[in-house]
Each structure stands twice: as structure tokens, then as C-alpha cells.
């Protein structure tokens, strides 16, 4: 099929990847209202076109935590990303490396830290959950540091997994899930060979390395449910700082007061995020949550935004709403599932081209030039 946008990659991934993995990435929690609002709220913000400005020199690059990024985006942590392409985390990391942006490895990745880090030149980021087993957390931080990871992304909006009803229907969870997955593999032979056979082992690499035994995909949801720690508090940041000296970003902030606390407890950045609508359905979209957070802490801490970004225009919208950078999750997973490393590289090229068009026609030569004045909120017209 012809690929011209991220939405095309979504359709291509739907065809190639079996339903239990496609819907795991594509779905949200409960009735998926927040998932839908993440997209629609961005769509309802129009760009303010300005003309007859000299836009012959345009720069999409930024510096973030001492790193030069070719565009203001980072590939977000995605659990079990290695199930969308053969050793998928390695392919996605190499694509990000080639395009000059960071890749964030999830705690619950298929490929372990020690496999991904040597495959790329630039330092990757590492994402960590608060888990009941503090020994695992300490081990993961030590391994990430030893592998040269530059930035820690500390995810705080998962003290318990969200209720993802779509997973029950797709075979990711629910009755007879193992049989349903095998049957889906038969109807998706290219994926079954490339990932199912050539992409083994299908284990949670970081967890298995620590446990000394294989924690497979069948154990994935159960392991998360058992090990997430609902006692998480701001004091956990102080404990983590004992083992991590580099930049630390708190992911899962939707309230200005929490953003202020992140500043107070010494975080270097926050990610304004509702976990892509995968945790608590009914919360604010990131686009709606971002402006008051930016008003509260802009300049005191780096602000990254995710959830709902489907094209380069959405990146410009998030920047104008107050973000310093963005994270891409579903968009790169669709591309990875559709075409592996090449798909992710092409997706990033598409986003960058869309950004350049938007910046040119809103008369913003650099990323720091993009301000709220570049937007028109259609809901107020």
C-alpha cells in the first residue's frame, strides 16, 4: 500500500500484525474516551497562518539535557515493543539514532538494555516504573548507567494497570488467550515468521535478566499486576536519586500542582501525559492539561508532552501550547509494525517534513519561536 502519513502506517500495521498485538498498541482503557479526546482536542486547535516572512532559513533542532536533537521529539517507552518487528526495540532505536532523536527503552521491553545500547551510537533513554521489588529497580538503574543511558524517564501514572477492555477481546488477555494468539499467527504468516520464529526469545528481557529465569509474554500482564506498587510517593524520587545522577524526567503529569512538586523534588523534566489514554479514562487530554502546567512551571523544568500526536502539525501544536519537546508512542509503533526500522525512519521523515511546512506557514523559523500566538482555538470561535 502507499504510505504518505502516520495514519497509513496504522492501517499497514493492522494488516501485518496479529490482532492481539495491534489492539494492545491501538487501544485505550475503559470506553476509550480519553484516547479519542487526545486526538480530537489537538484537531480542534487551528494553526495561525502568517505570510510574507523570510522563511528561507528554518531550524527544527533543539538541545535537551545537553543532547542535540534534529527535531523536538523522543521515541517514547513502549512495553513489549519487540513484538511488533524482529527484535523491535533494536530496530526502533537504530531508526531514532539515524534520524538524530533519542529512543527510550521500556522497563518491560523484549530486548534487554545490554542488547539495545550497543546497537546505537547515541545514548538511549531508559524508562523505569516504581515496583514492589526495589532490588529490581536498583539493578535496572545500575545496568542502565553501565550501558551509558543518558536520561531516566520515571513513569508515575501506573501504580496499578488500567482496565483495557479491548485486550480481553483481542487475545492479549482473557480466556483462551494462548490458543487465540496461535490462531492469529496462522493468519499473519509474515509476522509469524519474522517475529514469532526469527525474533525469539519473546521474554521481558530486562526482567528475565534480573530474575535469572524467563518471564514470557504470557506472564506479561500478570507480572505487571503483581509488581506495580500503589504505595508510590514523591519520596521514591529521593531514593532513585541515590542511584541515578543524570537527568530524570517524571512521566505522567496532568496537574499543575504535581508539576510544581516535580520541580520541588528536583526533577529535570516532566512528561505531560495520560499514558496515551491507557490508564484512567475520563481524564484531561494532554493538549488541555498542558497550558496550565506550562503557566505554572515553564522555565523551571523541561516540559515534554505526549498522547494524541499523530503528525508533525500536532508537534507544532504541542510546542505552541507550552511544551519544550514531545514524545511519540503509537505513531512509531505503527510504523515499526508495518515496516520495521525503515518504517520508523520514514515516519520520522514524514513528521519532520510536516513540521517544516507548519513552521514555514506560521512564520516560525526556530522551535523557540513557536508560541501560543501560533494557534487559534476553534472551540472559542
From Swiss-Prot:
GO terms for cellular component: plasma membrane. The keyword Cytoplasm does not apply. One of its GO terms (molecular function) is FMN binding. It is an enzyme of class 1 (oxidoreductase). FMN binds at residues 106, 127, 155, 251, 306-330. It catalyses: (S)-lactate + A = pyruvate + AH2. Its main location: membrane. Keywords: Cell inner membrane, Cell membrane, Flavoprotein, FMN, Membrane, Oxidoreductase. It is a peripheral membrane protein. The keyword Cytoplasm does not apply. The active site is at residue 275. Its EC number is 1.1.-.-. GO terms for biological process: aerobic respiration; lactate metabolic process. It is found in: Cell inner membrane. Its cofactor is FMN. Catalyzes the conversion of L-lactate to pyruvate. Is coupled to the respiratory chain. This is L-lactate dehydrogenase.
Amino acid at each position: 500500500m502507499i504510505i504518505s502519513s502516520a495514519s497509513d502506517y496504522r492501517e499497514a500495521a493492522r494488516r501485518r500484525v496479529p490482532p492481539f498485538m495491534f489492539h494492545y498498541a491501538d487501544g485505550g482503557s475503559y470506553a476509550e474516551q480519553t484516547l479519542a479526546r487526545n486526538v480530537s482536542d489537538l484537531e480542534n486547535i487551528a494553526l495561525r497562518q502568517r505570510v510574507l516572512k523570510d522563511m528561507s532559513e528554518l531550524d527544527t533542532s533543539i538541545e535537551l539535557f545537553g543532547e542535540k536533537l534534529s527535531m523536538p521529539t523522543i521515541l517514547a517507552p513502549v512495553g513489549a515493543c519487540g513484538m511488533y518487528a524482529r527484535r523491535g526495540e533494536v530496530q526502533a532505536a537504530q531508526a531514532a539514532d539515524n534520524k538524530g532523536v533519542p529512543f527510550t527503552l521500556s522497563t518491560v521491553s523484549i530486548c534487554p538494555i545490554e542488547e539495545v545500547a550497543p546497537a546505537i551510537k547515541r545514548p538511549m533513554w531508559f524508562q523505569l516504573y516504581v515496583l514492589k521489588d526495589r532490588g529490581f529497580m536498583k539493578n535496572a538503574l545500575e545496568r542502565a548507567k553501565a550501558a551509558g543511558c543518558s536520561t531516566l524517564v520515571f513513569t508515575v501514572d501506573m501504580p496499578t494497570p488500567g482496565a483495557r477492555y479491548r485486550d480481553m477481546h483481542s487475545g492479549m488477555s482473557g480466556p483462551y488467550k494462548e490458543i487465540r494468539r496461535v490462531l492469529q499467527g496462522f493468519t499473519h504468516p509474515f509476522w509469524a515468521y519474522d517475529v514469532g520464529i526469527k525474533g525469539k526469545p519473546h521474554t521481558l528481557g530486562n526482567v528475565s535478566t534480573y530474575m535469572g529465569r524467563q518471564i514470557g509474554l504470557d506472564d506479561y500482564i500478570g507480572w505487571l499486576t503483581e509488581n506495580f506498587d500503589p504505595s508510590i510517593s514523591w519520596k521514591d524520587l529521593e531514593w532513585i536519586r541515590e542511584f541515578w545522577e543524570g537527568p530524570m524526567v517524571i512521566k505522567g503529569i496532568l496537574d499543575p500542582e504535581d508539576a510544581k512538586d516535580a520541580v520541588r523534588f528536583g526533577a529535570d523534566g516532566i512528561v505531560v501525559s495520560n499514558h496515551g489514554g491507557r490508564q484512567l479514562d475520563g481524564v484531561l487530554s494532554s493538549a488541555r492539561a498542558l497550558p496550565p502546567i506550562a503557566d505554572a512551571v515553564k522555565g523551571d523544568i523541561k516540559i515534554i508532552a505526549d498522547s494524541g500526536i499523530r503528525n508533525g502539525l500536532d508537534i507544532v501544536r504541542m510546542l505552541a501550547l507550552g511544551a519544550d519537546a514531545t514524545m511519540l508512542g503509537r505513531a512509531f509503533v505503527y510504523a515499526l509494525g508495518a515496516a520495521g526500522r525503515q518504517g520508523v525512519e520514514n515516519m520520522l521523515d514524514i513528521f519532520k517534513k510536516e513540521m517544516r511546512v507548519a513552521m514555514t506557514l506560521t512564520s516560525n523559523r526556530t522551535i523557540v519561536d513557536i508560541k501560543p500566538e501560533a494557534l487559534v482555538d476553534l472551540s472559542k470561535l
